[in-house]
Each structure stands twice: as structure tokens, then as C-alpha cells.
Amino acid sequence: MAIVSLRDVAMVMVTVQVFARGYPETDLVVRLPGQPKVVFRQYAGYVDLDLNAGRSLFYYFVEAEKHPDTKPLTLWLNGGPGCSSVGGGAFTELGPFYPTGYGRGLRINSMSWNKASNLLFVDSPAGVGWSYSNRSSDYNAGDKSAASDMLVFLLRWFDKFPELKSHDLFLTGESYAGHYIPQLADAILSYNSRSSGFKFNIKGIAIGNPLLKLDRDIPAVYEFFWSHGMISEVVGRTIKIQCDFSHYTYAYPHNVSDACNDAIREAGDITTEYVNTFDVLPDLCYPSIALQELRLKQMATKMSMGVDVCMNYERQFYLNIPEVQMALHANRTNLPYSWSLCSNLLNYSAIDVNTNMLPTLKRIIQNKIPVRIFSGDQDSVVPFLGTRTIVGELANDLNFKTTVPYGVWFHKRQVGGWAIEYGNLLTFATVRGAAHAVAYTQPSRALHLFSTFLRGQRLPNKTDIAMHD
């Protein structure tokens, strides 16, 4: 008589549970190469948007570590435009795994946001990561088409995961997700107003270091450079005198004077060669050294202030391993190029980059959807200096009064950053010591900021307030 082990019984029970939930068996990720053992399930695969065009978006879904049946669902989108949410958000910032120091395995991210929520990462639009289209014109994308495709994606993804339709839905992201997330939220609210059936249970949006208003975000870059001693008094003064950013455009020559362009070019030359402008604090990882050590299967990690500054190269190496792509059900079209974080295929509308997002955010907040904007204070690419002003402008336009004045918030009895709240629906917070990718550089503070938002709580302004992530 055959003897059935407890392990076999457990595996059968897991399989039955997966089938019972109605989740897609073919998308179940059994285990990633080099992955530590975990108790939660993960899924990955494609959602077809247009069969005639052959346009499909790739996703990676991770259940909450505990109680996934009752935890909310959080969508995360990276920016760019044109950068991978799977590679960036999932495997570098807030997902459950980080690549190991030599890029051939994974280690646990002890501050993963799946401690608080189910997580969904989507490579959007088509042409980013493993998302694709068989029609080359689809790679001419913009804000409107990106939001439209993501709305279709979510509707069809919920058909794959019907049990999650009723869960609270939070939309989150960073950088150019300052465009992606508000426009998707706006599309969802419009869909809900028209639908007589299913409605998205949207509960809030949170965006880190977001591009919101180009004519304010751009001058903030040079204010940051000057205030951090990264450019000279002469260059800083020249930019202040010569540059009128009120009609600045993304495309060169930016609709500014030649003297202004000369000054900002000089500022860029001074600051970008030896400093990571996305995080001005840590040392750089030099690719030639990192890649050489990867080939030798040695630790390429060069730790600086507790941050693995070479993780970008480790992630690149790991996600290009064929066995990893097979485990993720990725690259089903056998793309003729290596996976990379940001797309070289995408031709994204430069005009859309100029769009002021405040009217869209205003509509969202008027629909009683809470908005939390947060900024890593060591990011010079979309600095908090501009974002703080922009959020204040939005609050003024909404006629919101200050409900919590600007002041420190705490985490683990240390200053986590500074925050201000307007009208009980709009919050701006800095994260102390964090970069453009907040969750990567300050993972514990980022998880705390995220968890409090999900629970509808304010960031604690006293050290003795007991709060759990």
C-alpha cells in the first residue's frame, strides 16, 4: 500500500484551495530559481488586451503574507515613462524578494509591502518589460492610451482573479506614475459612474516623488542642486536669472532661452557624472566592476549606508536567466533583445509629459478618494521642494484648510520625515533619508507610511504612539 506523506497532503490542500478560489492554475508561480521558502502564493503571466493587434500586458501578483482573503489589493506602477513595474517595484523596491549579491538567486525583503496588502505589478504600457504588441504603432503611446489599456487590463485581470473584485483597491506608484495613477483613477471613477454592474472598490491613491507639474518640478531640480552644494553660486544664480520655467516643455530646447539651456546643461555636467541624481547620498556602483564580479559569481554588492547600490545590475542579471523567465511564464514571444528595466521601444508622447495633473487629482479628491503624496528627501530628479509646493497649490484650489500642520512624523522613535494634511483627504509627506525609490532606500519607513495609509491613519506625530506595520 502506498504511503502518503504529510507534505503530499499539504500540497494537495494548497492545490485544491487555488482551484477553489478560481485563480488561474497556469499562472501559478510554483517557485522562482534561488527563491527562499515562503508561505504566500505568487502568480505571473499575461492579460490579452487586443487579440487582433496582439497586445498583451505582463503582470506579477503576490498574495499578502497573512490573511490574503481579507487584505486589500494594491496596484503598483513604476514610471519612466516606459520602466518596468515588475523589475523596479517588485524585484528592487517593495516586493517580497531582492536579487542576491551575485544575481543568481533571491533573498527575502523583510519590509515587503505584502505584509500589509496583496500586491499587483504590471508592466505598462505595451513595449515595457515583457509586455508587447504585434503592431508596432502600439508603441506610440501616451497618457490616454496607457490609462485606457490599464482599465481594460484590470477588468480582464479580475476575470482571472474574481475573488479579489470586492477587495479594497489602492493605486500606487512613483515618478511618472504621477501621471499614470491619477489618470487611471480618473478612468476608474468614470467607469464606475457608467457601470450598472461591477464597480471598482477604489479606496485611495499614493504616489512617491511624482511628476505632477513640469513647470514647477523642473526648477525644483536646480533649487535642490544649489541647496545641497552641488552647483556653484554662479551657476545657481544664472539659472535663477536666465530661466523662465513657466512655459517649460519636456522636448528640447524646452521653450527657454539659449542662456538658460547653457546654464542647465552646465549644471547637469557638474552633477551627473559622479553622483546618482536619483539618490544623492550613497556612492555609485561602477558597472564594469559589478559585471566582472557577477561573472566570477562573487558578491557584487557594495554596501553604502545599508543600501545595495549595485542591485540594478543584480536584477538585470537575474531577470535575464532563462529559467527565471520560464518560472514567471514571461517572454512568451521570445523577444530578440535582453530584458531591461526601461524600454528602448516605447515612443511616449513628449506633449503628455507637459500635462498639469492637478485638475485630475482635484476630480479624484472631490470623489472622496484619499490621496497621499510622498517624497524621498534625497531625490534630486523630482525633488520634494517642488512637490510640496504643488500639493499646497492643489489644497488651495480645493479650498482645503490645513487639518494637521507641517511637522515631523515618527517611526520606531526616530523622525521618519515631515508631513502636512489638508481637508482630511490630501497628505504630503517626506521620507527622511529616502531617494527617488523610497521603498528601496528606506524600506521600514516606506512600509510604515504605506500601512498607515491603508488603515486610514495619520502618520504619528509623537514618539510614544504604538503603531504596527
From Swiss-Prot:
Gene3D superfamilies membership: 3.40.50.11320, 6.10.250.940, alpha/beta hydrolase
GO-annotated cellular components: extracellular region
Any one GO biological process: proteolysis
InterPro entries per the UniProt record, alphabetical: AB_hydrolase_fold, Peptidase_S10, Ser_caboxypep_ser_AS
Entry keyword annotation includes Protease: yes
Location in or out of the cell: Secreted
Source species, domain of life: Eukaryota
SUPFAM superfamilies in the cross-refs: alpha/beta-Hydrolases
Sorted UniProt keywords: Carboxypeptidase, Disulfide bond, Glycoprotein, Hydrolase, Protease, Secreted, Signal
EC number: 3.4.16.-
Protein name in UniProt: Serine carboxypeptidase-like 41
Species of the source: Arabidopsis thaliana
